[in-house]
Amino acid sequence: RVMFADPTLEPSENRAIFVDPVNLAVLGDMTVYGTSGILPLRQTIDYLHTSLMLGDIGRLYSELAASWMWVAALGGIALWFYTRPKRRINNRFQNRRRVHVVLGWILLGGMLLFSATGLTWSQWAGGNVDKLRAEMNWLTPQVNTTLSGQHEVMDEHAEHRSHHGGMVMPEMAMDLTQFDGVLSAARNAGIDASRLEIRLAKTRDRAWTVTEIDRSWPTQVDAVAVDPHTMQVLDRTRFEDFPLMAKLTRWGVDFHMGILFGLANQLLLVAFGLALCVLIIWGYRMWWMRRPAQSAVSPVQTLCQSWLALSVWGRGVTVLISVLLGLALPVMGVSLALFVLLDWLRWRAATRVTLAESSAK
């Protein structure tokens, strides 16, 4: 499979030519997606997952889920900790609750992992995550294509960004025989993965890059910069030298995408998704069974009412944490503001009803 950048395709899409390695016959020509070159079926699944096939507007849905999933997971654990009975009680509700709690503990690590890795390539929070990683020196190093200068950084989420993930095709004329020389130089320098990406220089004063793109375990993402005229290796990066957080990001993203451990990884993702659906439905069922039967006996309980019941210090801390999270995770901030507005309107309406009933008495 040989993939080429094509400016007529959508972002992150490439044209793939399938060639028989024995007789060099062309067996196929189709559009693939991302650095790994996934085929149309998985591409459709990916678009459904990231944006519901609605483009940038649809990406708000997945970012909303990633922004709140870790809150729901940790909030559920906190709720269980403060409301768990001191002694084991065997009744229908407690048995249902026990199933929900056990399943929640089992899925907790996955919910935190997928929330964190999903946010790293999200449309709005992703930029803030990148700034944090840059400040903490957690970015992935990239080979320098000039004879002097600083190392650049690599984007682990190139497949989900708004640019092409394949080779850059410069406008200047090129000698196709240079591919063999550059590849040979890279092989001699230790680039031995079966899946490679060769990026041509955009300008004459830049080197070509050869990058391993095998994200399955063990990860092979070493890269070299090669002078296409002298075939000398100018710079290289090795995965074993990456900062720990850069390695964890690489592994986390690849696990999230079902690449790291192949079929086993994908089956685990399917099982996690189904179990998460069961957890959510089970939680709503418990809430439905315990919902107030009569509004007169159980008056409206709103977030505003609970917030007012806190101490002044508690209110201040709650507001501060909410503002900081809203700035770091913009989609969470906007959705929280809308929720608080609706809750406030509901609280005001309930307050008016209570005052009216008191006046009537």
Predicted regions and their residues:
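Membrane-interface anchor segments at the N-terminal boundary of transmembrane helices
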Residues: 261-272
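Short, amphipathic, aromatic/basic-enriched membrane-interface segments that mark the entry/exit
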Residues: 35-39, 297-310
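Solvent-exposed, acidic/flexible segments
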Residues: 34, 38, 54, 109, ...
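Extended, hydrophilic extramembrane loops/domains of integral membrane proteins
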Residues: 7-48, 190-197, 207-257, 261, ...
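Short, intrinsically disordered terminal tails adjacent to the first/last structured region
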Residues: 355-361
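Internal alpha-helical transmembrane segments
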Residues: 44-139, 270, 281, 287-288, ...
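Membrane-proximal low-complexity regions enriched in glycine and acidic/polar residues
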Residues: 129-246
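Hydrophobic alpha-helical bundles that form the membrane domains of multi-pass transporters
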Residues: 1-3
